[in-house]
Amino acid sequence: MAPAGRKLQHESRCRPSRPVDAWRAAATTRGRCMGTPGARRTARRGGWGLPRTSSGLAAAGLLCTALTACLCWGQLPPLPWASPAPQRPVSVLLWWEPFGGRGGHSKPPPDCSLRFNISGCRLLTDRAAYGEAQAVLFHHRDLVKGPPDWPPPWGAQERTDEALELRVFDDQEGAVMLAREALETTGSRPPGQRWVWMNFESPSHTPGLRGLAKDLFNWTLSYRTDSDIFVPYGFLYPRSHPAEQPSGLGPPLARKRGLVAWVVSHWNERQARVRYYHQLRRHVSVDVFGRAGPGQPVPAVGLLHTVARYKFYLAFENSQHVDYNTEKLWRNAFLAGAVPVLLGPDRANYEGFVPRGSFIHVDDFPSAASLAAYLLFLDRNVAVYRRYFHWRRSYAVHITSFWDEPWCQTCRAVQTSGDQPKSIHNLADWFQR
């Protein structure tokens, strides 16, 4: 999976700032090379490098396609079967495994070469290797739980909570100065070592940001496209062989017995998604699954096979923030073969990730009643409903593998970045804007 935008590891001018640019660029590559009016006129005139014969044109077209692929293949997310060039060896220390994974039940870190074709990557879990790591990865939700296991200099000599908090948290005036003094007295980071802040929750569910000291981290790793290491919950990539009827988990339309499904794990009446659900259910039947609210248990066949029996899936995020589209869209809807009904960031933001005809957005309708009327219309008009699946002929869905993929992408970022120093001056201002 490729980070996008201004990220250090992406310096090619061909690379897009958003995933949508990748699939749009792929869709237009043939037109730029072979189908433009200018190219056809040049061919008729016998211009430079374009033979007049049909066989010559075919050869020229293949050559043009190959050259374009060489120049701009970086636009597309690297596929699991791609063969990257050998990279310099890099060690990344996982200071915490997310959500308390460190301990007797934790699994060993992945082999990035086998999983993602990222060679030269060594993931470390032994904190004694702190001094040899080129990058140290911190998971925010674990970072803000408390100070006992913070890294040097905050964990080297000062062992009281009060002293450690003064070093890591900017809760009072002079904390940054004291942290810098601690760097001098208890040992600094190895030269060039990056501290990477990792978080995949929305700003609404990311406590403790305002307390973190300024200039503590060098890089950010998140779902945000403007992160230093951009790892979305999923993305689309071009099929190697476009198909009229691509195979997938979703059953044939005749087997879709239900209309609208929603799987929800946390129920909060104050959330926008719950309020909208109450309005929607007055006008159309919604089957709710999960352990929260009015949900019924997910059947034994599993979540994906359950959702696959429905025409629509409510991909309602727990909060609405830029770029925050999660497994509710990529896994629960797209992978299951249901049309997603989205409540999250605005439509324009979603269209930065997926084709506009692949989803329905609640903002497209003045009320929940009008959305319900449209869903019932699509239920009766099969041809119109099927249009929401046309994109599947050309694109497939990649689901991010947590947490292996973000870890390995950190290795790739270190390998391909330069040595220019950088720090995040105010993490809260960046993430909460």
From Swiss-Prot:
Cysteine pairings via disulfide bonds: none
Gene3D superfamilies, A to Z: Glycosyl transferase family 10, C-terminal domain (3.40.50.11660)
Residue intervals annotated with topology Lumenal: 75-433
Tissues where this protein is expressed: In adult, highest expression in spleen, testis, brain, lung, kidney and skeletal muscle and to a lesser extent in liver and heart.
Pathway per the UniProt entry: Protein modification; protein glycosylation
Spans within the Cytoplasmic topological domain: 1-54
A Pfam family hit: Glyco_tran_10_N
CC terms in the record's Gene Ontology section: cell periphery; cell surface; Golgi cisterna membrane; trans-Golgi network
Chain segments carrying region Disordered: 1-20
Residues carrying sugar: N117, N218
Similarity remark: Belongs to the glycosyltransferase 10 family.
Protein name: Alpha-(1,3)-fucosyltransferase 4
